[in-house]
Curated annotation (Swiss-Prot):
This is Olfactory receptor 4K15. It is a multi-pass membrane protein. Its main location: membrane. Glycans are attached at residues 2, 5. SUPFAM superfamilies: Family A G protein-coupled receptor-like (SSF81321). The lineage of its organism: Eukaryota, Metazoa, Chordata, Craniata, Vertebrata. Keywords: Cell membrane, Disulfide bond, G-protein coupled receptor, Glycoprotein, Membrane, Olfaction, Receptor, Sensory transduction, Transducer, Transmembrane, Transmembrane helix. The chain crosses the membrane at residues 26-49, 58-79, 101-120, 140-158, 196-219, 236-258, 270-289. It holds the Pfam family 7tm_4. GO terms for cellular component: plasma membrane. The keyword Endoplasmic reticulum does not apply. Residues 50-57, 121-139, 220-235, 290-324 are cytoplasmic. Residues 1-25, 80-100, 159-195, 259-269 are extracellular. Belongs to the G-protein coupled receptor 1 family.
């Protein structure tokens, strides 16, 4: 009987961000701090929104959900990448690789749809302010969040369906710090040209359609407020600037990686770091530094849990223990 298959690949080797041993400690420290900043920044937003009744509005409800998804996006691969900086051979099992593919498309797909929901929320708030609380009821907000997760699940299931049955029997080196779908499919033992086209079509449709909806929403808002007072125009511009910045930083790398046909591995690797790490750090900064309500709520939260009298007592106790 002839052997019909080569030995099946049971693990993949991740080449990581850099092959330089000298850079590994620096990269370990840098990305550990960045990941910690992502967790602290986004969990702070979630805590602030949930603890302050003044922020129990549709906009901040969606913002808190965005922060939660940002934590998920940062956590699907970053801890593994940080741990890999400490080892020479960076491997990941076949099942764990598929899990990374599943989660990255689930979370990023959900975030794209949620950003569209946030743009719709701003459209209703600015263009139809008298009907805002009726249109953006709590039930509608919950439905919008559930839709974002549902679309993300459908998107990632369809993407994973292209990969799970591919035969992997030869090369197993992935030139990235996580199992990126386009890179993994190219390692299959068969011609994956059609599969690659389906992957691009799936990701491209979700990315481009979401991005176009966002562009249309923001354009309508800007046209609507153009003839209003300078004060309302300034407030609308401030809000839109924050949203547009987040959208550009998130969608730009995703569209370039999955839609642009002339990208290279080195460029894709940098862009992957951008939308899985750097953008997620900027989101809390962008949304809080430009928002007086969030900053006021954070100050109130700090005064509640970090009272000067309590801090001084802790300091005195520490000094007393040190002098004993």
């Amino acid at each position: 009987m002839n052997e019909t298959n080569h030995s099946r690949v049971t693990e993949f080797v991740l080449l990581g961000l850099s092959s330089s041993r000298e850079l590994q400690p620096f990269l370990f420290l840098t990305f550990s701090l960045l990941y910690l900043a992502i967790l602290l920044g986004n969990f702070l937003i979630i805590l602030t929104v949930t603890s302050d009744s003044r922020l129990h509005t549709p906009m901040y409800f969606l913002l808190a959900n965005l922060s939660f998804i940002d934590v998920c996006v940062a956590s699907f691969a970053t801890p593994k990448m940080i741990a890999d900086f400490l080892v020479e051979r960076k491997t990941i099992s076949f099942d764990a690789c598929l899990a990374q593919i599943f989660f990255v498309h689930l979370f990023t797909g959900s975030e794209m749809v949620l950003l569209v929901s946030m743009a719709y929320d701003r459209y209703v708030a600015i263009c139809k302010p008298l009907h805002y609380m009726t249109v953006m009821s709590r039930r509608v907000c919950v439905v919008l969040v559930l839709i974002s997760w549902f679309v993300g699940f459908i998107h990632t299931t369809s993407q994973l369906a292209f990969t799970v049955n591919l035969p992997f029997c030869g090369p197993n080196k992935v030139d990235s710090f996580f199992c990126d779908l386009p890179l993994v499919t190219k390692l299959a033992c068969i011609d994956t040209y059609v599969v690659s086209l389906l992957i691009v079509a799936d990701s491209g449709f979700l990315s481009l359609s979401s991005f176009l909806l966002l562009v249309v929403s923001y354009t309508v808002i800007l046209v609507t407020v153009r003839n209003r007072s300078s004060a309302s125009m300034a407030k609308a511009r401030s809000t839109l600037t924050a949203h547009i910045t987040v959208v550009t930083l998130f969608f730009g790398p995703c569209i370039f990686i999955y839609v642009w046909p002339f990208s290279s591995y080195s460029v894709d690797k940098v862009l992957a770091v951008f939308y899985t790490i750097f953008t997620l750090i900027l989101n809390p900064v962008i949304y809080t530094l430009r928002n007086k309500e969030v900053k006021a709520a954070m100050s109130k939260l700090k005064s509640r849990y970090l009272k000067p009298s309590q801090v001084s007592v802790v300091i005195r106790n520490v000094l007393f223990l040190e002098t004993k």
